[in-house]
Amino acid sequence: MARLRVSTTVEAPPDDVWADLADISSHVEWMRDAVAIDFTSEQHQGAGTTFACATKVGPFRLTDHMEITAWSPGQAMGVRHVGLVTGDGTIRLRARRRGRTKITWSERLVFPWWMGGPVGAVVATPVLWWVWRWSMRNLRRRFA
């Protein structure tokens, strides 16, 4: 299992950050590995929303099927990966002084045997950490 956690602090209050994060279709604008998002549910926000996210890391491409499992405006968004790669993740927002917000993105991912299973997770973790760190920098720039 790959376990990842990245954080950044942005120059905006949690409600402003949430307004941006709540637009799931815009995640391709800041997530380094996200290429396209296609909703598979009629709703596009809130718990129960489902979508397919085409991802690309280097030469590797796959479609990540996800479901929003938690939706607490201004606080947290949870996701469950239900495709080839399974697991769960959470983006949490915490108010900081001077109207800033700390964003923490945590994921636990399980890779199928043909992607190396636990060994693949060990190899993928530092690569994914770098990709998600870059994504957090992109997200921070949206509030600069």
What are the functions of these language-model segments?
Residues 5-7, 63-65, 88-90, 106:
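Well-ordered beta-strand positions in beta-sheet-rich domains
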Residues 9-13, 54-58, 69, 94-96, ...:
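Solvent-exposed residues in well-ordered beta-strands and their adjoining turns
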